[in-house]
Structures are given as C-alpha cells and as structure tokens.
C-alpha cells in the first residue's frame, strides 16, 4: 500500500507512532503543547545530582524492585528531569495509586538521580512515610475487566500537604506530576495478546496490571512535568478549599491532556453516553409518552429506553482495536493481493477542525472492517460505525461494538421511543466531535450499482448539528472497489429469488475456512471530494445565522437539504471510482451473446476502454488499473474469473453462466464512467447514419433519466460537450465516419461486420438494457392510457413485463427487472412533468410522452420495440356486474 503521512486528527490530537521504538525526543517535544498552564511553576535550574534523602527505601520496595527490574525498560521524558530538583523537597504526583506505579516511579528516579518517592520528606508532611501521592485510587478488584477512568478523586494527601504549608512557614514543597504508560504502543512483534494489556483509559485491577507489566513493561514511558511550587500557589490568597480544588483540577487536566497526547483520546464512553442520552429532554419526554401509552410506570418506560440505548451504543476499546489491527493484517495478506489507498492525503488536509462523517459505498461486509483498519493504520482515529442489528451476533457483535460499531434496527417506524433514543445518541456523538461512518444506501448493493440513498441518518446528523453547531461537519465519500466478492454466491441466490439467509454465528464460523482459502484479488479504497455541511446549508438555508435551533423546530428547508446532500454523496462516490481489471473484463465480455471473445479481440476492447477513460477523464479522483490488457487477462485467470479454451485458430476466453451474472455486478460498478460513449454507440446499434445534431438532441432528452439512475455529475450542457468529445474520438479511432463536416453533419458507422462495428457494438451494450427499461415503462403507460395506473401499479406492471421479456428472449442482467429502477424512472418523469397525478393519484400524460416514445426508434430496433409492446400488460379491470333483467 502507498505510505501516507499520519496526521493527528480529529481535534488536532497527536497520534502515537506505530511502534514503541518511536523517537523519544520528538515525543518529548510534542507533549508540552498539550499541558495546561500550571498555577505556579518553579524556576528551572541547571541539572544536578540530587542529594539523597535521609533514610533508606523500605525493604519490601528493595525486594520487589529487584523482582520487577528484569521486566521493566523505561523511556524517561524529558531527557534531563534532574533539572527539576534544586534541593527543595519534592513530592511526586501520580494519576492513580498502584504498587506497580510506585515501583516504576522509584526506578525512574534512581535512573536519573532524583530523590526516591519511597523515602518520606523530613517531618513527613504526608503522614504516609513516602514522598508521592495520587489523584485516583486503583480498583482493588482482581478482575480482568477494566473500570472507566474518572471515578472518585482522593485528595486527602494533597489536603494534608497544603495544611502543612499553612502550619510551617518555612516549608516549600514542589509537586512534580509524573505520567506512566506501560505498553503505550507495543509493536507488531509483541503480539496481539500484549496489546490487550497495553495502556488505555481504563482503571484496572491488580491482576490485569501485573499482566500488563509482565507483557509490556519493556515499553514503558515515564513522563516528568515541570514542578509546581505549593508555596507560590498558596500565595495567591485563595481560601483553602478553593486552593485544593484548583490544584486538583489543574493536575487532572494535565494528566488527561498528556494521556490524550500519548495514547489518543478517550473513546470508551458507552456508560457516559447512555446516561447523557437518557437525561436528554427529548428522551425524557418520549419516556413519559411511552409510559402513558402503555399505561405503565415511568420506571418501566425508562428501563425500556435504557435497554434501547444499551443495545445501540458502541463500546470503543483501544486495546481491542489494536489487537484487531494485527489480526486483520494477517487476514488481508492471506485473502487479498493488496489493499491500495488513494487520495487519503487530501482528506488529511481538509479534516483538521472538522467532525468527519465517512459515507462509503456498501458492497460487502468487509467494508466495515477495511475502512476502520486503513484509517487506524494511518494514524487516524477510527469512526463510530452504524451497523445493522443483524450483525449483533454473539461474540462478533461484542468485538464489533468494541471496534466502534453501534447497532440500529432496520425499521424504527412506529416506535417513537426508540427513534428518540437513537436520534439523541447520534446527537451526542456529533456534539462530542466523534467521527461517524454510515452507509447512505442502507444496505449492501446486490447489483453493483449505487442504490438510491436513504436519508434517515443524514437527517439525524443535520438535526444534531443544527441543535449544537460546535464543530463544522465534513462528509467524506469513500469508494471501495473489489475484484471478487465474498458474498458473491449469496448475492447470486438472492437475485434468483431465494430469500436472504439470516446471519448467524454458526454460519460465520462455517464460512471462515472457505474464505481463507480463496484469492479475492486486490481491493482499492478511494477517498472522494469532501462535502462541507455548511456549504449545503448556505445554499438551502441562507437565512440561518449559525445559532442553535430548538429540538422541536423542523425547518421547511431541512428535507430538500437532506435530499440534495444524499444525492451529492452518491455522486461524489462515483467520482472517486476505481477501474480494476475485472471491471474492464466485464464490460468487454458481457457485450457478447455467449460472454466469450477471442484473445486478440478482448485485448483490443480493453485497450479501447482504457483509452476512453484516459482521453475523457471522468474526474481527477478516478483511478484506473495500470496493467496492460494481457496482464489483466492473466490476473483474471489467476483468481478463477476467466476460463481459457484452447483452439487452433486462437484461444477463446469466456466466463460461465453464474460467473457471467456476477460479472454484471463489476460492470455496473463502472457503468457511469462510460455513459457518454455508450450513448453514442447505442445510437448506431440500429442506425447506419445519424446527424450530430440529432445525437445531441436525444442525448439532452435522455440525460435526466441517466443522471438520476447513475448519479452523474454534469449538467445537460456539459453532457452534450462530452458527447461531442466522444464523437470526435470515435472518428479518430475509425469507429465512426464523418460523412459531412458541418456542425450538424452526418455521421456513419462502417458497413458489414468489421472489427470497428464489433467494438462499437460492445461499447453500446452496457446501456442498452437501461433504454429497454425506459421503453417498457413508456409502453405500459401508453397502452393503459392516462388516468388508469397509479405509480405503484405502474412499477409492478413494468417489473412483470421485464421479467417476461427476460424469460421469453435473451436472459438479462438481474437489475433489468429491479423495481427500484423503475421507481426512479417514474419519479423522474413526474419531476419533469411528463406525467402527473390526478385527484385519484392516477398518472396523467399528454402527447409529449408519445413523442418521447417515438424517439425510441433511434435506439431500439423495430423487432425489440414490437416485442416490448406485446409483453406490456394492461391493468386488471374490475368485473362489470350486470344487473338482473
């Protein structure tokens, strides 16, 4: 994979290096930026060897120290902490208590010549026979399960120290905060088990801490901070209680910022988020309404809301994510021939200061893991991922949840309490600045096309931002391209009518050995052009002044903004497509009746496709495989996509029946990239000659429907320009001939069955079935007449006609009779006012639709048009009851 420079974001937090052997000096230089300004810092002095305190360390400390020394190797920051000792008494401050912390601190002090924390100060002002204190007390439990950091703060020792300064005017103790990180970032040679016990935000028990020291003690960081003079702090004249609280607050803030700088921000906030969700006013109102509706006690409704929130919430765990990254590295190396990433550097430039919402294409369950893995490996905090509740399987669900997934139900219609809890949870994530990832398509595409977006999560994100516009939101489209799908066979079953199998832990376990034996080719992840939410709001809500909107306010511009944003996301995903070898093979081979070509013809067709992409680039973020056509064919044979049949007149390359259906998936991935060239080629399928002006007129007519179906980025004028460019290129390649040279001149294809005619037909084949679908819809409407069919009835009749056409004649691609594609076409007809509903919601139309249907003769052959008209059904008419005579 290409190397990317890690950028610490979000919130500008420094990211840890990928290995524990990072440059110590660089780390030390970065950390002071994260420290709070202390109330009083003693002046630094030149380094010196500290005079030893009177007395020896306790015998138990010497014994345990000898036992621990072989397991500890310390990186001490800064390089010369001895400069903090000027002979005045020093008390070290730790983030939390623990025997291991005391021993590590003692070892660090001995190594740099500082006074031991285990020898008390003269007079023992702490009254604990030691010279260190801690803000928090570690759990006494021996459990392996960590507790959340940030519990009760113990300040007795600090209070005693401050009181001693009030009693003794000559006393001036320096507090030196010391941060200890055991196994902050163990390298990959340490193993995934060691990572489970590496440093994180959780307070852990003694046994877990012991394992952490044994496994990761050799990658321990000890960070000394500048000293704080208690005498100068007390000189501020604050009351004793306020002095104590201020000092504790400064120390807590210091430790938190150092911890964030070293191991990243605290994302393990499941309990906190759930509590915040349940305390929100909107959820409390929903709980009250639910209790009244169910005629139950408010506590019962609260328990139901709590169960919903707990079912939804992620439980991010840094150790689990690190362990998973090690495991996934081995998995990717075994099943993929590489994972390529493009344009991530552009995201890193745009993302600082923004909350990033990742909106990738969704074609495989691998999407969840791949994107989070790639971000983590490049120093970016993985996002919280929206996942379907069907993936909340035993064990697997827990691991996904600890990797940042939060689970939502497929349908929340009619469940106001669940909707309120989910909306509030998303609002808390947005307000907290967490990055989020969701799939606007709602589910995995079974056809390879981008599905029509569902705006539910986008609407929740917008409303959350409008409620608390703290940090600008950036939507990041991501295209994920595969050469072979793990779910290919199950998609094939679903497309042929078999119901989708429910996910189960046993099914997953059963599939693992089979998956690990396969070669799934290469994966490419392309980051598209980001979309700033504020730019969308500036267009749809120019009067919004940036002030928070009340939760119950629903502005009229919200729905159009959601629709525009969801369409723009899909368009930007398509603008970041990758064209891999299997995409190019699918475009070529599926254009032939038997899905087979001679090797020379296949090489020529692939070369033509690559030339079209190079001479008429779709966008600057589209990537194309650099392989030659010959290498593409070899690669397809290696991953068992292509079959070679030897023949004396030349080898024939083909795909089998099931593989051909699956190849249509990969053709559809990149269909939008060839829209203009396919359109021009389609017009010459059944026409020997055609005028340039006619091509442009028909192109403008059909473009709105193609744009809605394929999420194309151009205006009609820009699409017309691409048609002109395509014509010029086809003329240069000899695929078309200029009969006359004027602007509206006549173009012609070659006569007979030449190679040029064959290549032109192959280019046009990919859009042929789209135009057939359009004609089916028009034919069904015209056959039934205006005011007869509703939109839903028309969809069903179109689907039936397409299925029958596929059964009686040449088999079609699975999406040919996809009802959602007919629905999109009908919706666009309504937007263009070519059809409109009457008072009974029946579709009306006029002679313009007849004229539109007549234009089909330029694209579809006479026989095909006649066949479609024959299979187009009429609506069932109610039986007429004849009254008795």
Swiss-Prot record:
EC class: transferase
Signal peptide interval: none
Keywords of the record: Acyltransferase, Cell inner membrane, Cell membrane, Lipid biosynthesis, Lipid metabolism, Membrane, Phospholipid biosynthesis, Phospholipid metabolism, Transferase
Annotated motif HXXXXD motif, positions: 362-367
Chief place of localization: membrane
Membrane topology: Peripheral membrane protein
Domain comment (free text): The HXXXXD motif is essential for acyltransferase activity and may constitute the binding site for the phosphate moiety of the glycerol-3-phosphate.
UniProt-recorded name of the protein: Glycerol-3-phosphate acyltransferase
Species per Swiss-Prot/TrEMBL record: Xanthomonas axonopodis pv. citri (strain 306)
């Amino acid at each position: 994979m290409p190397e990317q420079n890690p950028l610490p974001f979000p919130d500008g937090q420094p990211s840890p290096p990928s290995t524990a052997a990072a440059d110590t000096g660089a780390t030390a230089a970065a950390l002071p930026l994260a420290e709070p300004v202390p109330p009083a810092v003693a002046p630094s002095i030149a380094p010196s060897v500290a005079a030893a305190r009177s007395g020896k360390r306790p015998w138990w400390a010497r014994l345990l120290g000898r036992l621990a020394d072989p397991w500890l190797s310390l990186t001490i920051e800064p390089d010369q902490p001895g400069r903090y000792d000027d002979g005045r008494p020093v008390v070290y401050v730790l983030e939390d208590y623990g025997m291991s912390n005391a021993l590590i601190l003692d070892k660090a002090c001995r190594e740099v010549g500082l006074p031991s924390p285990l020898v008390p100060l003269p007079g023992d002002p702490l009254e604990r026979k030691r010279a260190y204190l801690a803000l928090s007390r570690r759990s006494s439990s021996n459990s392996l399960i960590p507790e959340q950091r940030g519990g009760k703060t113990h300040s007795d020792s600090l209070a005693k120290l401050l009181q001693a300064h009030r009693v003794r005017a000559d006393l001036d103790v320096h507090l030196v905060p010391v941060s200890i990180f055991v196994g902050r970032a163990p390298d990959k040679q340490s193993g995934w088990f060691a990572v489970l016990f590496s440093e994180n935000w959780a307070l852990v028990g003694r046994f877990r801490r012991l394992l952490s020291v044994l496994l990761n003690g050799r990658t321990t960081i000890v960070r000394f901070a500048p000293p704080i003079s208690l005498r100068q702090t007390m000189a501020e004249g604050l009351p004793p209680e306020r002095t104590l609280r201020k000092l504790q607050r400064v120390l807590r803030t210091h430790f938190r910022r150092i911890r964030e700088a070293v191991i990243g921000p605290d994302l393990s906030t499941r309990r906190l988020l759930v509590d915040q969700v349940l305390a929100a006013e909107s959820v409390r109102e929903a709980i009250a309404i639910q209790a009244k509706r169910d005629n139950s006690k408010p506590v019962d409704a609260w328990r139901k809301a709590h169960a919903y929130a707990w079912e939804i919430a992620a439980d991010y765990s840094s150790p689990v994510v690190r362990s998973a990254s090690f495991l996934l590295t081995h998995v990717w190396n075994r099943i993929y021939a590489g994972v390529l990433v493009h344009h991530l550097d552009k995201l890193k430039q745009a993302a600082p200061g923004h909350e990033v919402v990742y909106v990738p294409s969704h074609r495989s369950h691998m999407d969840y893991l791949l994107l989070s893995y790639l971000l983590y490996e490049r120093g970016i905090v993985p996002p919280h991922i929206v996942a379907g509740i069907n993936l909340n399987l035993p064990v697997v669900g827990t691991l996904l949840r600890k990797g940042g997934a939060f689970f939502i139900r497929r349908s929340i219609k009619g469940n106001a309490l669940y909707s309120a809890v989910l909306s509030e949870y998303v609002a808390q994530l947005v307000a907290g600045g967490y990055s989020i990832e969701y799939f606007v398509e709602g589910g995995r595409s079974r056809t390879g096309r981008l599905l029509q977006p569902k705006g539910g999560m986008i609407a929740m994100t917008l409303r959350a931002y409008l409620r608390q516009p703290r940090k600008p939101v950036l939507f990041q489209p991501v295209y994920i391209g595969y050469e072979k799908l793990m779910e290919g066979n199950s998609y094939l079953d679903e497309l042929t009518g078999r119901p989708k199998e429910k996910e189960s832990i046993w099914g997953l376990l059963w599939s693992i050995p089979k998956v690990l034996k396969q070669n799934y080719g290469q994966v490419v992840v392309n980051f598209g052009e980001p979309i700033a939410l504020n730019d969308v709001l500036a267009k749809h809500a120019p009067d919004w002044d940036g002030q928070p909107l009340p939760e119950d306010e629903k502005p009229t511009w919200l729905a159009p903004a959601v629709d525009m944003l969801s369409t723009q996301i899909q368009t930007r995903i398509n603008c970041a497509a990758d064209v891999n070898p299997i995409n190019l093979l699918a475009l070529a081979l599926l254009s032939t009746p038997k899905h087979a070509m001679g090797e020379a013809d296949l090489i020529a067709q692939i070369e033509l496709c690559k030339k079209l992409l190079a001479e008429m680039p779709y966008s600057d973020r589209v990537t194309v495989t650099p392989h030659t056509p010959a290498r593409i064919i070899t690669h397809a044979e290696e991953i068992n996509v292509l079959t070679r049949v030897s023949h004396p007149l030349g080898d024939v390359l083909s795909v089998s029946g099931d593989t051909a259906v699956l190849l249509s998936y990969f053709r559809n991935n990149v269909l939008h990239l060839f829209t203009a060239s396919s359109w021009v080629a389609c017009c010459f399928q059944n026409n020997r000659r055609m005028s340039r002006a006619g091509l442009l007129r028909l192109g403008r007519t059909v473009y709105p429907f193609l744009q809605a179906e394929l999420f194309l980025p151009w205006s009609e004028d820009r699409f017309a320009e691409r048609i002109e460019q395509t014509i010029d290129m086809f003329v240069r390649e000899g695929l078309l001939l200029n009969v006359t040279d004027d602007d509206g001149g006549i173009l012609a294809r070659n006569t007979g069955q030449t190679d040029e005619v064959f290549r032109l037909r192959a280019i046009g084949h990919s859009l042929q079935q789209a135009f057939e679908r359009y004609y089916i819809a028009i034919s069904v409407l015209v056959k039934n007449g205006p005011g007869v069919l509703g939109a839903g009835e028309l969809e069903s009749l179109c689907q039936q006609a397409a299925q029958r056409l596929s059964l009686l004649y040449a088999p079609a691609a699975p999406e040919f009779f996809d009802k959602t594609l007919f629905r999109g076409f009908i919706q666009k007809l309504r937007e263009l006012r070519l059809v409109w509903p009457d008072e009974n919601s029946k579709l009306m139309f006029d002679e313009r639709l007849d004229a539109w249907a007549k234009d089909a003769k330029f694209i579809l052959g006479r026989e095909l048009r006649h066949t479609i008209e024959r299979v187009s059904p009429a609506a069932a008419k109610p039986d007429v009851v004849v009254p008795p005579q």
